[in-house]
Amino acid sequence: MAEQPIRYEFIKECKQTGARLGRVHTPHGSFETPVFMPVGTLATVKTMSPDELKSMDAGIILSNTYHLWLRPGHDIVKEAGGLHKFMNWDRAILTDSGGFQVFSLSKFRNIEEEGVHFRNHLNGDKLFLSPEKAMEIQNALGSDIMMAFDECPPYPAEYDYMKRSVERTSRWAERCLEAHGRSDEQGLFGIVQGGEYEDLRTQSAKDLVSLDFPGYAIGGLSVGEPKHVMNRVLEFTTPLLPKDKPRYLMGVGSPDALIDGAIRGVDMFDCVLPTRIARNGTVFTNEGRLNMKNAKYERDFRPIDEECSCHTCKNYSRAYIRHLIRCNETFGIRLTTYHNLHFLLHLMEQVRQAIREDRLGDFREEFFERYGYNKPNAKSF
């Protein structure tokens, strides 16, 4: 049998927490896990160049099937030689299936066994996305890791609805495997659903593991549920997944959730949070978040975070960044975006080092204390 395009290499387990250190091998290089993946929705991580992403050690980025299908069209990306060539990125790329966007962006949708009828959120045109179509688009994009097309139920959802949804997602996963045309070049991950119901998560994981995907995602979290619910779901879901395959928690990117997810056995994370809040002038620091529009930074000539080694912090002051953000200058957004992405990528580097040293529990305690998560009514990002 030919070697799988995606392979997980286990390195070690943290004796203090059970978190795992590993490495994922792809056709476009390998990366250590736990890892955070910057999101490049439209084949670009907003305001960042590929070289800038490399300078902060991003080993894999995420791109969005739904958005690239609408603009510029997967046929154009294929003609360009695939997503890697199109955007000049020679490291790993993961594409989502488009399912989440269909369920979150379209106000009008009709779910049937065959797929989902919905309206284009840009112009109202009628569209149809099925497991087969999602595979066709992702095969054309040529990402290293593709995602199965799943149903994304709202939170909270009634048990009976969720049960039907999980069963449909399992049937769709099987159809995705059958329709996947480049299984020797692209790895396809299944997505475990089931909301907060343990028996449904168990059923979903069992169904998908029996299909032997090269990796598994945990979907349906970070959709509005409290953080303790997410942690509880992870506690009973990750042990259901194979130890020799990567585990990916979709749509999660706040520092606390990254650390807590790693402690519960997750290997891969993605989220638009660092880039989205950067565009509003909000930045991560080791002492918590700062809003750079705040008047108190008008004459503050220190870097955003004096412990940070990123390009922004080595070269520019809070006062300068505040000025740029308040004047809606693109360069200000570039500086805050670079810093936030670097902050999360560096945080994951610290998490990996703490796993090596069997002290991730201690690291969590120190980080949470400084960041402000232990304060009463602390915000979760």
From Swiss-Prot:
Cofactor(s), by name: Zn(2+)
GO cellular component: cytosol
Domain of life: Bacteria
Entries under Pfam families matching the protein: TGT
Keywords: Glycosyltransferase, Metal-binding, Queuosine biosynthesis, Transferase, tRNA processing, Zinc
Protein's UniProt keywords contain Magnesium: no
Cofactor binding comment, as recorded: Binds 1 zinc ion per subunit.
Region RNA binding, annotated ranges: 251-257, 275-279
Known partners and oligomeric status: Homodimer. Within each dimer, one monomer is responsible for RNA recognition and catalysis, while the other monomer binds to the replacement base PreQ1.
Biological role stated in the UniProt entry: Catalyzes the base-exchange of a guanine (G) residue with the queuine precursor 7-aminomethyl-7-deazaguanine (PreQ1) at position 34 (anticodon wobble position) in tRNAs with GU(N) anticodons (tRNA-Asp, -Asn, -His and -Tyr). Catalysis occurs through a double-displacement mechanism. The nucleophile active site attacks the C1' of nucleotide 34 to detach the guanine base from the RNA, forming a covalent enzyme-RNA intermediate. The proton acceptor active site deprotonates the incoming PreQ1, allowing a nucleophilic attack on the C1' of the ribose to form the product.
Stated family: Belongs to the queuine tRNA-ribosyltransferase family.
Protein name per its UniProtKB record: Queuine tRNA-ribosyltransferase
The organism of origin for this protein: Bacillus velezensis (strain DSM 23117 / BGSC 10A6 / LMG 26770 / FZB42) (Bacillus amyloliquefaciens subsp. plantarum)
Lineage, uppermost ranks: Bacteria, Bacillati, Bacillota, Bacilli, Bacillales
Encoding gene, per UniProt annotation: tgt
